Amino acid sequence: LYTLGYNASKKLINLNLAVKENLKTYLSQYRLMTDAVNIKDAYIINIGMKVNFIARSGFNKDEVSLKIIERAKQFFNIDRWQINQPIIIQELAYELSIVEGVGAIVPPTQDNPNNLSILITNKFSSADGYSGNIYDINYATKDGIVYPSLDPSIFELKFPNTDIEARAIGDSIGNQL
């Protein structure tokens, strides 16, 4: 059984030994005589995201950018995610494309070898508060889906206010920024 918990700030953490022992004791009443209960920590893969967009004419690009960030926060709300759930880029792109003021989602050109509409990056620096787990997002991305590790793991947008970058690159009447 692979587990994780979260702290008061809803950031993923490994469960302490007391919680694991309580869980093991509770589950033992439902196991068969020959079964064993092994509780292990799942891996946390911290991510960031970059999205470029074209704003509709008449909309403030900064306000649209903030709305995109809010929608991305909702998409990556940890209560909506499970261990080993992949990130389907097209679902995220659709969610962001229906934000008021967004004309189009445009693939970032820098550091985007798969030319995806939204760039997902690995944030791993322990010194910056991340899990320390390094994960090759580009290698794990196939056909617009970011797959988790073969080891039980979960994607987490740990610091959404800094880990989400939304950049207006133009507007719907052809002005480039």
Which residues fall in each region the model found?
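Acidic, low-complexity glycine/serine/threonine-rich segments
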Residues: 1-177
